[in-house]
């Protein structure tokens, strides 16, 4: 089981949804420091987070996932402030299929840049002590989604990156493990205005099915994701659907 005592946690994402619920629950652990990284600060939510556990130092760092220089500068400041990073959770996610650049940038390339910029503060051969990176994907990273093809492409990319970084050789050298979370349909801001954010107009059947389907609450999904993290399975992928946790066992189609 993962020991949260004295850990420095970095969360990249908004002040809502599953990722934010994870932060609120992690504040109840005996962590040392919580760093929130997003393009805009929500002062009231930061105060609410701090109030959960006054003994944890909570800080905010402005960062634009669409800008590599912004990511570089912000992550360096956060790493220097913390000294080292133990846990990094990439929880940002947008569903804007008509805007390909933003969908890929916020969901995938920004996540890759932020992870790689954080690695010097996690890698035990550099300034880190080892740790854990958790990347938020989706069940649409495992299956196709004809209504949201660009979003699905980004989610598939997250899993490819996470599994590759979760290689045993990388872990043995860096001490950093990687995991991916694939939530099912969840009550969140992302689920609003689905019809305005489809890839193209031939998507009515899928949108209607999603709109009428049952959804899990962000807090129950967050609880299960933290449980998965505590199992410390490097390179693993987890479906979190309707408050239930299930590990994904990938099929190998090719081997060198």
Swiss-Prot record:
SUPFAM superfamilies according to UniProt: NAD(P)-binding Rossmann-fold domains
Protein name according to UniProt: Fat body protein 2
Listed Gene3D superfamilies: NAD(P)-binding Rossmann-like Domain
A Pfam family annotated for this UniProt entry: adh_short
Amino acids binding substrate: 138
GO CC annotation terms, alphabetical: cytoplasm
Source superkingdom: Eukaryota
Keyword Endoplasmic reticulum: no
